[in-house]
Design a protein with these regions (language model features):
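N-terminal secretory signal peptides that target proteins for export/translocation
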Residues: 1-22
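Bacterial N-terminal signal peptides
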Residues: 23-36
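C-terminal/domain-edge helix-coil "capping" segments
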Residues: 42-51, 60-66, 71, 109-112, ...
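Extracytoplasmic
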Residues: 45-50, 63, 67, 75, ...
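Charge-biased low-complexity segments
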Residues: 49, 167, 184-316
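Solvent-exposed, acidic/flexible segments
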Residues: 57-65, 99-103, 112, 134-139, ...
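Short, solvent-exposed, polar/charged sequence segments at loop or secondary-structure edges
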Residues: 66, 80-130, 136-137
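Short hydrophobic alpha-helix segments
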Residues: 84, 156-159, 269, 304
C-alpha cells in the first residue's frame, strides 16, 4: 500500500485576542440567533384538555362520572375541565346524553365544551330476573372516549358487575372506575389519538388527495344532473355482534364510502358512530360490497356515497 504524505499549508498568524468591538458584535449576533430557539424550547407544551360529562341523570351515573374524573385528574398530562361548566355548556348546546353521534355533532359538542377530548357515558343499575336462578342487580357504565378535533370515537368500554344487592354491584363498579389501570388506559388512548391525528394532518399536507364527487341525496336530484347512482350487486347486512347484544344496543351507523370507476370500495370512514362493536361490523361488511359503478352521461366515474345501517336488538 502506497503511503500518501499530506503537506501542511504554511502557517498563518492568528490573533486570539480580537478587539472588544468584535466581541460585542459576536455576542449580539449569537443572542439574536439563539433567543428564538430558546424561547421555543422553554415554552411548555399545552396539556391535553378533557371534559367528562355525566353518565346519565341517575345517581349512579353522576357517581360514576365523578369517579372517572377524579381518577383521570391524577394524570399530569391531562387537564380536566370543570364539571359544572362542562355540564352547563352541554345542556346549552342541546346535548341530551346520546351515545350515537355523527362526526359533526361530536365536533360541535367538543367546540362548545372547549376541550380536545371528551368522555360521554351512561351508567345504570338494573334488577334482572333470569328464567333460572335468583334475581340480581347489574351495574354497568358505558363509556365513550371521543376526539373533539375529528369527532371520531377513539374507544369505548362497558364494565359491568353483578351482585345480589344494588349497593354491592354499584360499589364494585365504582371501585373499578377508580382503578389505576383505567387511568393509564385512557391516558394511553388519548396520547395515541393525538399522535395519529398529527400524522394524518401531515399526510394531508404532503399528499395531494384527489377530490371525489359526493353523490346527491336522491335519485331525482342525480337524474337532473345526468348521474346514475351506484348500485350494489347484492346487499349484505352487518352482523349484530355479541358486544352489542350484551349492552342491548340499538343505534344507527353511517359510513362514507369512496367507490372507484369500477364500483370497487377504496375507502370507508365512519360518519356516525355507535360503539359496542357496531362500527367495526359495519365497516367489515361494506368492504365486502361490490357496486355497479356510478355513471355520468354514460361514463363511469368515482363517487362518494353515504350508507346507513340501523341496528336493533334481536327479539328474545
Amino acid at each position: 500500500m502506497r503511503a500518501v504524505q499530506l503537506q501542511s499549508a504554511p502557517r498563518k498568524q492568528i490573533n486570539f485576542f480580537p478587539s472588544l468591538t468584535a466581541c460585542i458584535r459576536l455576542l449580539v449576533l449569537a443572542s439574536l440567533i439563539l433567543s428564538p430557539q430558546l424561547g421555543v424550547s422553554a415554552q411548555p407544551e399545552r396539556p391535553v384538555t378533557l371534559a367528562v360529562l355525566d353518565f346519565g341523570n341517575t345517581a349512579i351515573g353522576r357517581l360514576a362520572s365523578e369517579k372517572v374524573m377524579a381518577n383521570l385528574k391524577q394524570e399530569t398530562d391531562l387537564m380536566i375541565l370543570d364539571r359544572d361548566q362542562s355540564r352547563a355548556a352541554a345542556r346549552g348546546a342541546g346535548y341530551a346524553g346520546s351515545l350515537n353521534l355523527s362526526l359533526n355533532e361530536a365536533r360541535n359538542l367538543g367546540a362548545v365544551l372547549g376541550c380536545d377530548f371528551l368522555i360521554l357515558g351512561d351508567a345504570q343499575t338494573i334488577r334482572r330476573s333470569p328464567s333460572t336462578g335468583p334475581a340480581y342487580f347489574d351495574s354497568y357504565a358505558s363509556m365513550f372516549l371521543v376526539s373533539a378535533r375529528s369527532g371520531r370515537l377513539v374507544g369505548w368500554e362497558r364494565p359491568n358487575f353483578n351482585a345480589p344487592t344494588a349497593v354491592a354491584s354499584e360499589t364494585a363498579l365504582l371501585a373499578a372506575l377508580s382503578n389505576e389501570e383505567v387511568r393509564h388506559r385512557y391516558a394511553g388512548s388519548i396520547q395515541r389519538a393525538v399522535e395519529n391525528e398529527q400524522g394524518e394532518r401531515r399526510l394531508i399536507i404532503d399528499q395531494q388527495t384527489p377530490v371525489i364527487e359526493a353523490a346527491p341525496d336522491d335519485d331525482k336530484s342525480a337524474e337532473a344532473e345526468g348521474l346514475r347512482l351506484p348500485r350494489p350487486y347484492r346487499r349484505l347486512a352487518p352482523a349484530y355482534p355479541e358486544t352489542a347484544a350484551r349492552a342491548e344496543a340499538e343505534a344507527m351507523v353511517d359510513v362514507l364510502v369512496d367507490l372507484d370507476m369500477n364500483g370497487e370500495v377504496t375507502r370507508v370512514e365512519v360518519a356516525r358512530w355507535a360503539g359496542f362493536g357496531l362500527d367495526q361490523a359495519t365497516v367489515a361488511t361494506v368492504r365486502q360490497l361490490h357496486f355497479f359503478p356510478a355513471m355520468r352521461n354514460g361514463v363511469a366515474i368515482p363517487i362518494r356515497v353515504l350508507l346507513r345501517y340501523n341496528f336493533h336488538k334481536p327479539a328474545k
